[in-house]
Amino acid sequence: MILIWLSIFMLVFIMLTLGMFVNKKVSLDREKSSPFECGFDPLNSSRTPFSIRFFVITLIFLIFDVEIYLLLPMVYLNMSSPTTYLIIFFTFILVAGVFYEWSEGALSWIK
């Protein structure tokens, strides 16, 4: 089994090394790197602005989604199980983090 994984690793390594040597070198010019709009300079920036508040709300939602995922199996666990104490400790850390973010003002939408 180890021989199979070693041979796969070596094959991938050889292919990547050969790809680096065979790869056509491309010189980056300003004209080649810029977007093309009918021969004129672009009117707008290609980057769209993104509010960091939406990103923070998304992260908080993701964290508490994982918390719910961990809390659902607690219905079937024995309350004296070490896993139960670990999940309760993890939940306590998450709730303490939310209170800290709230006290710092990161959760207030309008300042």
UniProtKB/Swiss-Prot annotation:
Molecular function GO labels: NADH dehydrogenase (ubiquinone) activity
Chief place where the protein resides: mitochondrion
Keyword Lipid biosynthesis: no
Domain of life of the source: Eukaryota
PANTHER family: NADH-UBIQUINONE OXIDOREDUCTASE CHAIN 3
Family from the record: Belongs to the complex I subunit 3 family.
Coiled-coil positions: none
Compartments reported by the entry: Mitochondrion membrane
Organism: Artemia franciscana
Catalytic activity: a ubiquinone + NADH + 5 H(+)(in) = a ubiquinol + NAD(+) + 4 H(+)(out)
Role summary: Core subunit of the mitochondrial membrane respiratory chain NADH dehydrogenase (Complex I) that is believed to belong to the minimal assembly required for catalysis. Complex I functions in the transfer of electrons from NADH to the respiratory chain. The immediate electron acceptor for the enzyme is believed to be ubiquinone.
EC number assigned by the record: 7.1.1.2
EC top class, as a word: translocase
Cellular component terms (Gene Ontology): mitochondrial membrane; NADH dehydrogenase complex
Protein name stated in the entry: NADH-ubiquinone oxidoreductase chain 3
